A protein has these predicted regions:
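Conserved catalytic core of the tyrosine transesterase superfamily
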Residues: 1-161
Length: 161
């Protein structure tokens, strides 16, 4: 088992792992690192090294998220990132046991996205001034989003070929 390292050094190595081994997007990596940073701040306040964490510590952290008014879906995402981090620590032989293994996420319930009606979409597209290059670009963007059912992040990652 590897010796205790500075949490910032561990976080840097974890970032490389997420990008190279897991092939996650920059946005996802940033979200994971922000979530782990929240945990690290909690652990620092409690004077606990990330390698010394117990399930009780993680449950207390989870309760703090709830007390801060963070929505269950966001809590679940944060806890998922923490589980991924501790899985990484096991893989890299920093830890022998995973303290997050039995950590439960809050119930998130079924959330259906709100969608625009056909009339609303038509009104939106027709309101664009097509006499400018920007207007033509914006109409193309909206029609692509709508017709393909893309998220904005997916649209931004499209490559011309």
């Amino acid at each position: 088992m590897k010796s205790k390292e500075n949490p910032d050094d561990i976080l840097s190595k974890y970032k490389v792992y997420l990008r190279l081994e897991k092939s996650l997007s920059d946005n996802t990596v940033s979200a994971y690192l922000a979530d782990i940073s929240k945990l690290f701040q909690f652990l620092k306040d409690e004077q606990i090294h990330p390698f010394d964490v117990t399930l009780d510590n993680l449950e207390t952290f989870s309760a703090n998220l709830r007390d801060l008014g963070i929505q269950p879906r966001s809590q679940a995402r944060i806890l998922s990132g923490i589980r991924s981090f501790y899985h990484y620590l096991i893989l890299e032989d920093y830890l022998q046991a995973d303290p997050s293994e039995l950590l439960e996420s809050p119930q998130t319930g079924l959330h259906l996205p709100e969608i625009l009606t056909l009339e609303e979409i038509d009104t939106l597209i027709e309101s664009i001034d097509l006499s400018t290059n920007e207007g033509q670009r914006n109409r193309t963007i909206l029609e692509t989003l709508y017709s393909c059912g893309l998220r904005v992040s997916e649209l931004c990652n499209l490559k011309l070929s």
